[in-house]
């Protein structure tokens, strides 16, 4: 990879925002992948550490070459990580949103990410005890801690990660939902949900049934 910050000084803020969120999604999915290894996890966690420090700096100032160089490194590390560990549900869904509605790939990933974290960790099932939550909770909690987030238990720490992602999207003017984009009608979107879910499930990286896929896209 050619990691030269001077080549991306003129990249507009909106494209920077989409790109850095794609980097973060790459690293996060590699971290929680069931195919992860010690080596891929080390690369992904370092990428997340760099993103946490330099994401907003790179977005706010294209001339901050140090921040852009660090985000280049984060991108490369995340790429090496997911090349080994693979990606997951977030990318499977984002590919379909991009193909159907021409949403930039990083932006589609960013809008989906809070919902995918909640789905993978199952933290919205209030009736469960701490021990019954999915193994992804521990991995997401680790990611949150790398970003400097913490709470009194792992479940609340994962919630802090969801809040962090949503905060970053707001700071970078990325819509939190399809409806906030204002370019896709509600009817058009809901008519496409079934076909997008079916297409996402055809990807080998998806381990979710059709009903769950439709629920997430709703």
Map each language-model feature to its residues.
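Short coil/turn segments at secondary-structure boundaries
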Residues: 66, 156, 179-182, 208-213
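Gly/Pro-rich interdomain helix-loop hinge
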Residues: 103, 107-188
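Short, amphipathic C-terminal "tail helix"
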Residues: 187-218
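Glycine-rich phosphate/diphosphate-binding loops and the adjacent beta-loop-alpha structural elements
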Residues: 30-84, 95-98
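Glycine-rich phosphate/pyrophosphate-binding beta-alpha loops
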Residues: 76-109, 202-205
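Residues on a specific face of well-ordered alpha-helices
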Residues: 18, 22, 26, 45-49, ...
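A glycine/threonine-rich phosphate-anchoring loop and its flanking beta-alpha core
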Residues: 1-36, 135-142
């Amino acid at each position: 990879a050619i990691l030269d910050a001077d080549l991306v000084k003129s990249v507009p803020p909106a494209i920077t925002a989409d790109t850095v969120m794609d980097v973060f999604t790459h690293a996060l999915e590699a971290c929680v992948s069931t195919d992860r290894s010690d080596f891929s996890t080390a690369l992904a966690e370092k990428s997340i550490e760099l993103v946490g420090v330099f994401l907003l700096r790179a977005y706010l100032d294209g001339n901050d070459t140090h921040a852009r160089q660090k985000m280049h490194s984060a991108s490369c590390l995340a790429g090496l990580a997911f090349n080994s560990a693979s990606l997951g549900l977030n990318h499977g869904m984002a590919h379909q949103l991009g193909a159907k509605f021409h949403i930039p790939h990083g932006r589609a990933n960013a809008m989906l990410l809070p919902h995918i974290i909640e789905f993978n960790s199952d933290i919205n099932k209030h009736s469960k005890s701490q021990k019954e939550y999915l193994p992804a909770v521990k991995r997401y909690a680790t990611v949150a801690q790398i970003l400097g987030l913490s709470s009194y238990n792992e479940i609340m720490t994962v919630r802090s990660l969801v809040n962090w992602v949503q905060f970053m999207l707001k700071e970078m003017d990325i819509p939190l939902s399809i409806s906030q984009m204002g370019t896709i009608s509600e009817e058009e979107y809901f008519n496409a949900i079934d076909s997008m879910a079916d297409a996402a499930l055809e990807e080998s990286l998806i381990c979710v049934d059709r009903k769950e896929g439709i629920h997430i896209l709703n």
